[in-house]
């Protein structure tokens, strides 16, 4: 059953998603990680729970609700050499899998649902550094296209990052380097 590398990666992604979803599924984000969970004002089965592990600098606004979480199954951050070094921003190219099916993440940064073709583009609002890897981010959505998975998304977190750091050392101007990375993306609606 898990005889191929692809099958093992999928199994690992599913296990990782289960953990992420257990941590954030059906909760409302609170501004302080020290707050005690309290019953929600709406819905008998809803709960307000502090979501641990999100640095204060990259938390979405209080009242934001998670609508989906996705794990990078294959991804790269591509850097272009300028002035003999790989500096500046990177261009993402990744495949994600999660609560709303499969998602393509690409330059923009943009995310497009492969299930319903809904599309969002966002801009970086804040970042939180992580040693030896690309930073965790909070992004604010600035464009929506289509109805569906991403129709109500207002914020995106890039969390639990690994890899993706620009290569060190000299390079030839114009050369590119695609560096593998991993992350969990959490999509949030704004408080209504």
Regions found by a protein language model. Give the residues of each.
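Secretory targeting and sorting signals
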Residues: 1-34
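Primary mode marks residue(s) on the alpha4-beta5-alpha5 output face of response regulator receiver
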Residues: 34-78, 85-192
């Amino acid at each position: 059953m898990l005889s191929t590398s692809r099958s093992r990666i999928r199994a690992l992604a599913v296990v990782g998603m289960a953990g992420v979803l257990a941590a954030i599924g059906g909760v409302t984000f609170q501004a302080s990680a020290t707050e005690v969970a309290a019953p929600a004002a709406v819905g008998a089965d809803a709960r307000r729970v502090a979501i641990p592990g999100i640095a204060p600098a990259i938390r979405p606004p209080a009242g934001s609700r998670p609508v989906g979480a996705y794990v990078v199954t294959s991804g790269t951050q591509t850097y272009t050499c300028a002035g003999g070094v790989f500096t500046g921003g990177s261009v993402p190219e990744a495949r994600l899998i999660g609560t709303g099916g499969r998602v393509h993440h690409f330059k923009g940064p943009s995310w497009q649902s492969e299930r319903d073709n809904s599309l969002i583009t966002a801009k970086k609002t804040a970042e939180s550094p992580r040693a030896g890897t690309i930073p965790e981010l909070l992004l604010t959505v600035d464009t929506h296209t289509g109805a569906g998975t991403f129709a109500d998304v207002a914020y995106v977190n890039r969390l639990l990052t690994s890899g993706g750091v620009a290569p060190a050392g000299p390079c030839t101007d114009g050369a590119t380097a695609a560096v593998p990375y991993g992350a969990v993306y959490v999509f949030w609606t704004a408080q209504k």
